[in-house]
């Protein structure tokens, strides 16, 4: 106990010392203890006294301590307000000091202090230094989050930021004004970022003057303008399209989002083709990056292709996988291949998918085999070639390949009834290899559906009845359906005995309510009127439509508006996974906590990459 007291006393002695080095050492020790969860709030009065130092490094450390304990000790924090106001009003001093003071006051999060911040903030928004102005713009959003009336009505900060969008000449300040207005829109539940043609041109003129992070904010502002004239559309395309070749993935995706939106308004088909040709190389470049960046690019390409398939209609080979790629990228490429497959490229696609069947990753192999079946359903003229490919894969005698091929063939038989019955022979030869419930269910369905054409259908069906009680629901329900169909079609003694066994199980032993209820329904229906039962159960079923794996129109529109954000990764609207996002705002960017950050984290995309320094984390989150 005495040791701890002595240490605290030594730190206090250093804090009240007139030597800056001793003060810095003491505050660093305090912050180090603070970061590991120790309560050092008792030192608050002594730390606050150091705020008057002219040393910028020491001042930053003191501000960091005050921000951390402002909510815990709001009354003591008032002691630091005068010093903060003095630093914020030091117009002849260092602009970094003024900006730091304004930012610190905004981060305190104490409503009682917000009133004191308003006058320094008003000065900051009119400061001659752009760094101070950009810091002030973000503080407006912080004030609004705590006291909306104070920011909007009493001091008119919102109107001031809107004016700055047209008058401000510095790109960083413009970017932070846009960021603040978007954040306030999220809090308010109403979009207040109103961009007209004059503001849009002003933003475009500042687009190439700064770094990539600023460009992304400016592009977000530009994307809010909806042009009505072809001249405006053409000018916007001409001025932003150079950014599509940017090295930063966030800038590329932000530009593409705007271009795709503008293409919906373009009347000239030649312009559409020209813009799409310029978009393609940039996306291809992203696919040569690290696997994590590739995944983000693939997710966004998957959305883009549904909107504008012309972008990659002749470049399907780009999405062929190599064995060294991670599974998540290979699976995403398969989704894109399905959307791009056509009669012009079906042969090379089938050859590639056939090669994938020998991959070491079982999940990837099964998905590749499934895709062959989906191609058959999508392209009727290529169905024969797809079935032949599936039959060849069954002959490889690889169990999971056979099982996935049977599942795919079941869907093909439903799509094209009475067309590919020759493939049933190869299925009958591989019954013993089935251990997957879904594959078994698919085979049982095929036996029941074509029992009048399969030789010995009853003998094949009876093999699945011995352990019926231990089988999962999907097999039990399919055996019930197939046994009923087989009896109604064949009318043989064997099929009658099988049906009786299945009915006995369903009505007396089965614990699943769905199987039991259907068993009773079939039993009573066949007892009352077998002919009616035949018309109901053994009837011509509607052909399944093309397997649609895309997004519905509403979701696609939302994802296009949020291209390059986490919404495209989750494939959900932002309000579906961001709790603080207002439900009545659709197609808005995500809101994340901005405390202790210089910039509001406006648009996010996860880009994991290795850091060169060993002490830093291996994975980082780049904010775009």
Describe the function of each predicted region:
Residues 1-8, 14-23, 36, 53, ...:
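Acidic, serine/threonine-rich low-complexity intrinsically disordered linkers/hinges in large eukaryotic
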Residues 1-4, 10-83, 105-109, 185, ...:
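Alpha-helical solenoid scaffolds in large eukaryotic transport, assembly, and signaling factors
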Residues 4-10, 40-51, 75-88, 113-125, ...:
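HEAT/HEAT-like alpha-solenoid repeats
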Residues 18-19, 54-55, 91-94, 128-130, ...:
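Short inter-helical turns and helix N-cap capping residues of alpha-solenoid HEAT/ARM repeat scaffolds
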Residues 30-34, 65-71, 104-110, 139-146, ...:
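Hydrophobic residues within the alpha-helices of tandem HEAT/HEAT-like
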Residues 124-273:
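Solenoidal tandem-repeat scaffolds enriched in leucines and small polar residues
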Residues 161-200, 205-210, 288-293, 341-344, ...:
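WD40 beta-propeller repeat blades
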């Amino acid at each position: 106990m005495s040791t701890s007291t002595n240490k605290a006393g030594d730190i206090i002695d250093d804090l009240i010392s007139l030597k800056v080095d001793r003060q810095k050492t003491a505050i660093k020790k305090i912050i180090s203890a603070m970061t590991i969860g120790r309560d050092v709030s008792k030192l608050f009065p002594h730390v606050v006294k150091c705020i008057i130092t002219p040393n910028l490094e020491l001042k930053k450390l003191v501000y960091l301590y005050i921000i951390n304990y402002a909510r815990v000790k709001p009354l003591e924090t008032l002691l630091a307000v005068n010093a903060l106001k003095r630093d914020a009003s030091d117009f002849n001093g260092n602009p970094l000091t003024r900006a730091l003071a304004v930012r610190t006051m905004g981060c305190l999060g104490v409503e009682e202090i917000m009133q004191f911040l308003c006058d320094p903030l008003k000065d900051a928004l009119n400061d001659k230094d752009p760094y101070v102005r950009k810091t002030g713009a973000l503080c407006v959003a912080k004030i609004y989050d705590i006291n909306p009336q104070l920011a909007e009505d009493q001091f008119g900060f919102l109107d001031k930021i809107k004016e700055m969008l047209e008058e401000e000449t510095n790109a960083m300040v413009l970017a932070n004004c846009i960021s603040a207005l978007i954040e306030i829109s999220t809090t308010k539940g109403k979009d207040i970022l109103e961009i007209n043609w004059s503001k849009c041109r002003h933003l475009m003129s500042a687009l190439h003057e700064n770094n990539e992070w600023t460009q992304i904010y400016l592009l977000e502002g530009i994307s809010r303008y909806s042009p009505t004239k072809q001249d405006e559309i053409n000018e916007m395309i001409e001025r932003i399209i150079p950014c599509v070749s940017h090295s930063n993935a966030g800038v590329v995706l932000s530009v593409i989002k705007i271009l795709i939106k503008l293409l919906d308004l373009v009347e000239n088909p030649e312009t559409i083709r020209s813009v799409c040709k310029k978009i393609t190389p940039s996306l291809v470049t992203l696919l040569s990056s690290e696997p994590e960046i590739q995944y983000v690019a693939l997710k966004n390409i998957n959305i883009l292709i549904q909107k504008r398939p012309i972008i990659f209609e002749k470049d399907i080979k780009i999405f062929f996988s190599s064995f060294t790629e991670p599974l998540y990228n290979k699976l995403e490429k398969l989704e894109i291949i399905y959307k791009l497959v056509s009669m012009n490229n079906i042969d090379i696609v089938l050859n590639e998918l056939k090669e994938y069947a020998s991959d070491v990753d079982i999940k990837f192999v099964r998905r590749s085999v499934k895709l062959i079946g989906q191609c058959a359903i999508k392209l009727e003229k290529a169905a024969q070639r797809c079935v032949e490919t599936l039959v060849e894969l069954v002959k490889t005698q690889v169990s999971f390949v056979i099982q996935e091929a049977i599942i795919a063939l079941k869907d093909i038989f439903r799509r094209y009834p009475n067309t590919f019955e020759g493939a049933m022979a190869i299925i009958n030869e591989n019954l013993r290899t089935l251990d997957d419930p879904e594959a078994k269910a698919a085979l049982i369905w095929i036996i029941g559906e074509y029992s009048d054409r399969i030789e010995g259908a009853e003998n094949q069906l009876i093999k699945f009845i011995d352990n019926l009680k231990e089988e999962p629901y999907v097999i039990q329900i399919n055996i019930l359906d197939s046994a009923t169909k087989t009896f109604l079609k064949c009318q043989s003694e064997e099929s009658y005995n099988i049906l009786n066994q299945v009915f006995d199980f369903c009505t007396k032993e089965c614990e699943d309510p769905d199987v039991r209820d259907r068993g009773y329904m079939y039993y009573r229906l066949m007892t009352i009127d077998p002919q009616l039962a035949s018309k109901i159960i053994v009837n011509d079923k509607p052909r399944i439509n093309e397997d649609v794996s895309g997004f519905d129109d509403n979701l696609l529109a939302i994802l296009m508006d949020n291209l390059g954000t986490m919404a495209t990764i989750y494939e959900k609207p932002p309000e579906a996974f961001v709790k603080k996002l207002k439900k009545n705002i659709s197609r808005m960017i995500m809101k994340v906590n901005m405390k202790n950050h210089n910039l509001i984290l406006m648009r996010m995309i996860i880009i994991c990459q290795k850091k060169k320094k060993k002490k830093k984390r291996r994975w980082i989150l780049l904010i775009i």
